[in-house]
Amino acid sequence: TTTQPGTATRPGTTTQPGNNMGVDLRQRMRMAWLNHITLVKFYLISFFENLSGQNAWKDAVYKNAEEILAIFAQYYPASAMQRFCKLFMEHLRLTDEVAAGLKADPAFSGAAMENWYINAEEIASFLSRQTPAYNETELRKMFYDHLDMERQQMEAYLDGDYVTDIEIYLRSQQNMIELADFLTSGLLAR
């Protein structure tokens, strides 16, 4: 039997119709979250350097947010999605405020920073209410780790420590894969 291009499977999976739902969801979730940190990274660099393309990068970040939200919309009712959309857009708005604060003052620790973490708590709480398989404490830690790494990258970049910035970004990729897999497992358990 020959395998058609693009239809290879990993060990333990099949190509039977309906059996790839988990694999497809996992791939989409991973790509969406990896794209999230990559697009935010490029946007922040363009913001810090005042590059002409920063609005294009910002638009891409918001388009990616729609992609992430669309994944959850397959599992959550419309009323829940309205709340999740509001929380996620607040996350992006606060990321902007934190970046602006750090750009103006490397020692920035203002209300936006505190609200950024509060928003992460709210997202973790919301998701764990919608998907009982999610452990809220574990999810909150993953979101905190994401914000910690995002902040550390911004600080390293603004300090001109590009090696550390890159190292943290590469670690953040693993964090996003773990987050995506955690989110996928919970959705599949619904």
Model-derived segments and spans:
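C-terminal amphipathic alpha-helix
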Residues: 12, 18-47, 51-54, 58-61, ...
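Ser/Thr/Gly/Pro-rich low-complexity, disordered linker/stalk segments of secreted
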Residues: 1-15
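Mid-chain, structured segments of secreted extracytoplasmic proteins
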Residues: 62-99
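A short glycine-/small-residue-rich loop at the edge of a beta-strand within enzyme catalytic domains
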Residues: 82, 86, 107, 114
